[in-house]
Every structure is written in structure tokens, then in C-alpha cells.
Amino acid sequence: MVKVKFCGIASLEDAILAEKLGADFIGFVTDTASPRFVKKDFIGFVRRYVEIPTVEVIVKGNVSESIDKTKADLIQIHRVLTRRELDEIHMYRKKVILYVPSSDMYQEYFRSVISMGFNVLVDSEIKGSKVNLDLARGWAKEYEIGIGGGISPDNLHDFLSINPKWIDVSSGIEKYKGKKDPSKMLKIIEGVRKWKYTQ
């Protein structure tokens, strides 16, 4: 079954609800520019109340340092890395999720990070733009990938149709930035479960 990551969690209440509804893991954004920003210590606090894996999402900063200092089970780096950075964190590959833009110009980068054994999240190249689902579908046929980029209850089936290993949902399950909508969260979980039984 496709796994579900609810990202942009900014309250203990939403974290507990995500686990209760059936999310497989939850994400926390520690980039200060984000409206969903939380401090690293908050992740450690939440981990005392939930059992599902936690993911820290970073955009800037030294990647090795960020991995060493994270309070989460996994760390997601939401930028394209240099070859030097990839080599630097290769030993942590099972703990790291790398963002790959859904664009033809990143085909070589995609194959590099896959060949190195990293977990991959395919997302839109530019924030707010649509994901290239045709490209992602081709990648998903060959490799196990995660997919994100504006997933909501209304377009969930479009993303599930590429057969990803997992989906990353954030703004599509919000009442407003930083606050989740329980009904939308439930619709995503139910949609994924129904999809499993129709395949």
C-alpha cells in the first residue's frame, strides 16, 4: 500500500491526530522562512507522544551538521545538492530523503541519487507550480519514489496513478498555513486505502 507522510506539522495536536488517522510518518519544517516553521526541539517534544517516524525538512545550511543535530528519525533536504554534498552524506543515505525536481533537466541528478541509495521525493521544480506527473510516472515504473507537490483530496488519484511508494501532503490538508484540517486528512487516508483495494 502507498504510504502517507503528512508534512508541515506545527502543533502537537496535529501530530497526534495524524498518527491516529493512520499517517505512516509526519514532517516538520525547520526552515525559518516557512510559515510552518518549528524549532528542532519541538520535534523531540512531539516524539514523546507519537510512535510513527518523524521527518525534519530543511532547505538551507550544512547538510552533515543538520543530519548530526536532527531530533527526527529522518531528514529531508529540500534543495538540489552538489556532488560533494552527496558524497559527504552518503553514509547516512538510509536516514535521508532527497528532493528531486520533476523536470527533464534533473534526469541525471535523479539517477545519481537513486544509484547512491538515497530515498527520493519527486516534487515540483518551482514552489506553487505543478508536478510533471508524466516524468514522475516513468521514474516510478523503474524505482521506488515518493511524490509531492500540491496533493489534495481532489487530485489524490492523479498522484496515486503513478504508483509511488509514498505521498507527501502538506498544504492540501490545511485549514490555513500551519494548521491541519482533520476532514481533509481523513479523506487522504481513506482515498489511499480505497485505492489499494481497487488495484
Swiss-Prot record:
EC no. given is 5.3.1.24
Known catalysed reaction(s)?
N-(5-phospho-beta-D-ribosyl)anthranilate = 1-(2-carboxyphenylamino)-1-deoxy-D-ribulose 5-phosphate
Record keywords, A-Z:
Amino-acid biosynthesis, Aromatic amino acid biosynthesis, Isomerase, Tryptophan biosynthesis
Q: Which GO terms describe its molecular function?
A: phosphoribosylanthranilate isomerase activity
What metabolic or biological pathway is this protein involved in?
Amino-acid biosynthesis; L-tryptophan biosynthesis; L-tryptophan from chorismate: step 3/5
Q: Which InterPro entries match?
A: Aldolase_TIM, PRAI_dom, RibuloseP-bd_barrel, TrpF_fam
Write out the GO biological process terms: L-tryptophan biosynthetic process
Q: Where are the transmembrane segments?
A: none
Which Pfam families does the record associate with it? PRAI
Top-level taxon of origin: Archaea
- KW Transmembrane (keyword) present: no
The entry sums up its family as follows: Belongs to the TrpF family.
Recorded protein name is: N-(5'-phosphoribosyl)anthranilate isomerase
Organism, scientific name: Sulfolobus acidocaldarius (strain ATCC 33909 / DSM 639 / JCM 8929 / NBRC 15157 / NCIMB 11770)
Q: What is the lineage of its organism?
A: Archaea, Thermoproteota, Thermoprotei, Sulfolobales, Sulfolobaceae
The gene from which this protein is expressed is trpF
